[in-house]
Amino acid sequence: MKTFSEMSLRPVILVALFFLAILSSVPRVEAADAMDWPHWRGPEWNGISRETGIVDKWNPKGENVLWQSKEAAGRSTPIVMNGKIYTIVRDQPGTPKEGEKVLCLDAVTGEKKWEYAFNVFLSDVPDTRVGWSCITGDPETGNVFALGVCGQFQCLSPEGKLLWEHSLSEEYGLLSTYGGRTNVPLVHRQVVIISAIVIGWGKMAKPAHRFIAFDKRNGQAVWFEGTRPLPYDTTYSTPVLTTINGQRLMVFGSGDGGIHAFQPLTGRKIWTYNVSRRGVNTTPLVVGNTIYSGHSEENIDSNKMGALFAIDGTKSGDITKTGEKWRVTEWFVGKSSPIHIDGRIYAAEDKGTLLVVNAADGKLVKSLKLRGPVRASPLYVDGKIFVCTSNGIWWTLAPDKAAGVKVLNRTRFTSTEVYGTPIVSHGRLYVPTTGALFCVGGKDIKPKAGKRPETAKETPREEDAEIAHVQVVPVECLLKPTVDGGQAQEFQVRLYNAKGQYLRMAKPDEVEFTVNGPGKIAKGEIPGGAAPRKGWEYSTPKENVHTAVSVTAKFGKIQGEARIRLIPDYNWKFDFSNGKVPITWVGCRYRHISLDFDLLKKVEKESALASQLYIYLMTSFTNSNNPAVTIGKAPQVYNDGSPRRTWSAMLRFLGLLGQVKNVDEAKAKLDPAFAILAREKFVARHAWSAPGGGVQLAVTRGPRKVDGNGVMVKIKTIPKGARSQGWMGFIEGSNYTIQSDIQGATKDNKLPDIGLSAQRYTLTMLGASQQLQIRTWPTQLRMAKTVPFKWDPNKWYTMKLEARVQRSAGGATKAVLKGKVWVRGEKEPEKWQVEAVDESPNIKGSPGLFGNAIDAEIYYDNLTVTKDK
């Protein structure tokens, strides 16, 4: 069994004075030991070390290799802190117990100190991309932070003890995909910040690249903010810290194609520079007040691909036009992050050309072909640039005024690849590869480092004591209401100035709290801790409800907000008769809708096109950004006048793309279907127009709600959300059964895949292969069991998955999973059709859904979750 902790992050009561001490302290950002390397880009976040005496030459076959560790091989860039080297890698690869682990070695000898292993679950990432992220160390506490490919975010002590953890997928909606792109944590003072594409709940149901700041000491969520919704990509650009105009900033590349600057303690956005139509993966480089970065996608203002650019970081707001210092297109700097040396930028293109560029104006000085693609970033130390191609060609270069760079040495790895970046610490060079982690150095190492250059200072907070930002902590939580009263949650109100600097805690009499939803919040003495103290405490309602609550703290004219999900203990039942997908479900709204199944089938008998139009319009109305559209007070407009080309998207879904070229043809094809939907009072009116010669359609929703058999539909109208996971509740759940009526539609003789999840395992009806499968990791199938199972489209079935944790007398633990499917209305079969045992078990996890509706819709009804007796 993996070394999971069974601890859960229940509502935490914290002493206000304790937090005040934490928040008032301002520890140094750099490593306590000047030669430690606590972040993959180094203590200065720029790929530069001030050490000297680093070897020029080495060879993987032995020359200057002090030690190597095959167990530490992988994609990740390691870190070094307090004499230990940390990395994240595959665990027991190719076995039924394969997972992921944090590995700690002695930095001098390579001796293994400890490991912390955990499972990969409910993720499409392949095993070869496990260990994508990098460990981040906290010099103040010595703790390390790790993000696994499936969203397991953990804080570990220097001895490898789990201090706290979050399942970012189940709790917040982190997206884990086949691409494997996983972000890297950033520590700043009392918070640790992590990001991902998040498909959450409530106002965060639509995908966006979002950042969550957790208190590094206890894991409480402090702030939760994001960039523009509906990004095209997951990305792995790491945020870096800098100070500009006396203000501390976190600068990063985003999945929305922009470079952004946020305040790290508040999450408040300071500026945005939009540059790419797809996500930015390079980690920004900050030199003074200038930010350098690149991408290898299409530019937003032309059809040219790729760019290297410089931004003026002193600006604010949307600086797309006002903040650009220079940009050179058709340089494909999309994977490797640049470095800056003596007024020049050294940046590696994806295909392997090293560019040497004047930092001031972007003019090319020289270039060097590196003979292979590059994913790792260059390292500069002791007058040398180290860079390696992904096919294993290692270069040792020296900056040269005339030639750009001078080649000092070149060597090559065999039968290995390089994705991680070399680092240096205490006179030793560490080189990560997929074959081994190498430690490189001379025989008599005498570590020595020069002084780091002075960095810009923050404006003393005493110069601005005016309150400009109110922060309610925790910003998100999940509570269990019961008829007996349920749980309570203490809230803190933290106050910041305009530069995002912490000022103080608010006093109870200074803040007016309001609650939007059931439950109540009261101020007064809160028990617990060393002694009772004054504060605010929210109490759940005395009823078993699935609902969302927001609490708002108003300080003068400024306010802050926190969100609460109320989810009772099992047993649950959902029939979707209210026409809504439960707001508390993570990753479900937006990708699922509720509709009237009786109306759908009635319309389908008259016109298949009208039934498909009903699905499309219901999705569009439900997911509209304009609430007036959802309730029929304003029309939803479809045209091709924006990059999303909503008119073409509708035609594609209806199978009419290329068949309708003007308004007259559109009327001929669609007006009969609209007439049917108008008769049923689902559509109030629709209108055609032709602005600029193109087709435009405006549709206003009618008064009809879901008044027949309400069902939930996994829709295929969202191409990037057609295959997805969803989660329904708390992650501590174990030993329960999930059951639902399900139906799969068909299109072009293709069927969807339909699944229910329990305890991080999924029972899936596979459409194309006509199989029934229990699994935990779809792309690895380490413990999966599969049986033939023929099923038909447009037919209701009942699906049932049972998850159990079994512990033997000797202490061994395993998970036992059982699944069955039968035609709805028929007698439930006594025998389970598929059973699986996992000797490396998931011992807890949220109930949930899996669906692959790329080919056709999926319908759910009468869903239940029951606790085992």
What name fits each language-model region?
Residues G486-Q489, Y496-P527:
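Short flexible loop/turn segments that cap and initiate beta-strands
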Residues D36-H39, I567-G641, M650, A668, ...:
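Extracellular carbohydrate-recognition regions
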